[in-house]
Amino acid sequence: MIESVMAVRLSTGFCSSTALLQYRTAPSSEEGGNCFHYASRRVFQPQRIHHIDGSGFLKYNSDYITRKHLRKNRTQATAEYVDSASDPEKQTGKSRYHPSEEIRASLPQNDGDSRLSPAETTRTIIEVNNKGTLMLTGSIGDGVHENILWPDIPYITDQNGNLYFQVKEDEDVMQSVTSENNYVQVIVGFDTMEMIKEMELMGLSDSDFETEDDESGDDDSEDTGEDEDEEEWVAILEDEDEDDDDDDDDDEDDDDSDSDESLGDWANLETMRSCHPMFFAKRMTEVASNDPVDWMDQPSAGLAIQGLLSHILVEDYSDIQKKLADSNSTTNGNKDAENLVDKLEDNSKAGGDESEIDSSQDEKARNVVAFYKLEMIRIQLITAQGDQTEVEVEDVRKAQPDAIAHASAEIISRLEESGDKITEALKSLCWRHNSIQAEEVKLIGIDSLGFDLRLCAGAKIESLRFAFSTRATSEENAEGQIRKLLFPKTNQSTQPKPK
């Protein structure tokens, strides 16, 4: 059964220069002047994720993430490995980087043989994941269009890597997908909504805690009232400052010692004039009440796919029918639930309750699943650091998914059962191979050629790649090579046997 999903409707051209997203109160029908409507209260403002000129691709700005995470003492770093830790001159010589960038100097040159090709990586990401985020444009009448961000839509694939999205047939969002308007973008691999929420919180600092201009057509009278209140508040503080100065003329020493702590002095600061304390407190509450994204758990790569979406009949696609049949045969719980529903329907028919029969039929109609095929036009491979690689669609269709990638989560789960032992082993691996003293480490992906490790050291988050000695041919072989890297055998000198 396909669960209903939430679609976020976003107005085109409605954006701010200070934040990626903003929460705004849902407008009432009496307010008027609003050129958009949406299914949730989140407005998409594509300032940090935007289209590349001439390509229409969704561009991911890594500088934005890096700059913002410096303020959180946890930033993302570039994936370019430009120096080697094995060079004694570079180890002992004067550092060419800022202390917060020292990780970059200790990373080795990246070996291309230790990674899957872009086409193989793309095909693997498509096969391993089963949900994607749709971005499409719909019309709301009178020539006004809206952007729709629709997360977590389940899909299945065929033998060529094509995507078939499963949507409830009564979803109103898909009514905007027509033969003339079926151009969409799909994001696969990243937890899109969580990352957008995090970027929204980080974007608050861009405004320097100033209120933004209301672009949705609301009345500016409230803003004017707030400005007047702020002016009165500052004027009162200045009056108190003057009174304090008159009262303390006889004691200049006390004035000097208390001037930094007096109310009037700190009220004259520029930050206090540009930000009302109530506004500051409100923003602090918003930041503190939201759980931040744990960037240590984010995958090493994701996809931005550009293509055309079209409705299909499953009967015309044998591959899809076979996959659906296999899925149904392995889901015993769903079968039992369907049998129970059938029995309940039979009982209701025997009782002659016409209303219950009609309601059950309506429920079945609402749960009818429609399939939409994505005809891929362009594909972009995006790393967690923001590096982007365009991959040919034909190469992706010819490539085969990695044989070990499907078992990656299970291998990681078994390794993490060791608890602190595996954590210390991963930290030791970073130190032995890259001379990096990691504070936090986490396995984020495994394939037949090696594994990706996410580490936090100081104010930076970095991803490292460790290659296997030989290509893994099975799940057990891959896990064995990982354990061999984490727990190397030490060569101990043989003790002579006593005579």
Curated annotation (Swiss-Prot):
The keyword Phosphoprotein applies. Keywords: Phosphoprotein. InterPro entries: Haem_oxidase_HugZ-like_sf (IPR037119). Coiled coil: none annotated. The keyword Phosphoprotein applies. The modification Phosphoserine is found at residue 355. Residues 489-499 have a biased composition (Polar residues). Residues 76-118, 208-268, 478-499 are annotated as: Disordered. It comes from the Eukaryota. Residues 87-104 have a biased composition (Basic and acidic residues). Residues 208-263 have a biased composition (Acidic residues). This is Uncharacterized protein At3g49140. The lineage of its organism: Eukaryota, Viridiplantae, Streptophyta, Embryophyta, Tracheophyta.
